[in-house]
From Swiss-Prot:
GO molecular function: cholesterol binding
UniProt record similarity statement: Belongs to the calycin superfamily. Lipocalin family.
The protein, known as: Apolipoprotein D
InterPro entries: ApoD_vertbrte, ApolipopD, Calycin, Lipocalin_ApoD, Lipocalin_CS, Lipocln_cytosolic_FA-bd_dom
Superkingdom as given in the UniProt entry: Eukaryota
Record key words, sorted: Disulfide bond, Glycoprotein, Lipid-binding, Pyrrolidone carboxylic acid, Secreted, Signal, Transport
Localization (cell): Secreted
Name of the gene this protein is made from: APOD
Length: 189
């Protein structure tokens, strides 16, 4: 059993290093989310300021747009500018996991893939939002994801530090967070 755990650890470390994501020992943490979350105030465009690197976001000028769908769920439209100048976008759907905690959402982009958590840890709706997600792998490892979002392409460093402190206080490592390039970006439709 110990040999199997060592092998899984080594493989997870290699995969994480290759993809820019980090596998951590243990289950996903459960940080507190935004109290009295109001999705209607959250709707609209958000620009990505910083993130824990992901395999599925490789471009720049990354932004997300949230709106209400006819079925009552939330439309999620993520867009980025690729290095070759083309726009990459993906559309998904989010819905609350539990009506008593509306800041805990699940988002799904492909019908054949499971939903992923999308937890709004903090937002003032007008300037910033902090989003956290975590994927547990066979209850031994976890991969943390975090995004600092803003209504504008730039956010004061004090606000970024405030949001990173929320992550750190919940045992979410921010050392690998990277700044998203939001310079000279086109307006996506």
């Amino acid at each position: 059993m110990v040999m199997l755990l060592l092998l899984l650890s080594a493989l997870a470390g290699l995969f994480g290093a290759a993809e820019g994501q980090e596998f951590r020992l243990g289950k996903c943490t459960s940080p507190p989310v935004q109290e009295n979350f109001d999705p209607n105030k959250y709707f609209g465009r958000w620009y990505e300021i910083e993130k824990i690197p992901t395999t599925f976001e490789k471009g720049r000028c990354i932004q997300a747009n949230y709106s209400l769908k006819e079925n009552g769920k939330i439309k999620v439209l993520n867009q980025e500018l690729r290095a070759d100048g083309t726009v990459n976008q993906i559309e998904g759907e989010a819905s609350p996991v539990n009506i008593t905690e509306p800041a805990k959402l699940e988002v799904k982009f492909f019908w054949f893939m499971p939903s992923a958590p999308y937890w709004v840890l903090a937002t003032d709706y007008e300037n910033y939002a902090l989003v956290y997600s975590c994927v547990s792998i066979i209850n031994l490892f976890r991969v943390d994801y975090a995004w600092i979002l803003a209504r504008n392409r730039h956010l004061p460093s004090e606000t970024v530090d405030f949001l990173k402190n929320i992550l750190t206080s919940n045992n979410i490592d921010v050392k690998k967070m990277t700044v998203t390039d939001q310079e000279n970006c086109p307006e996506f439709s």
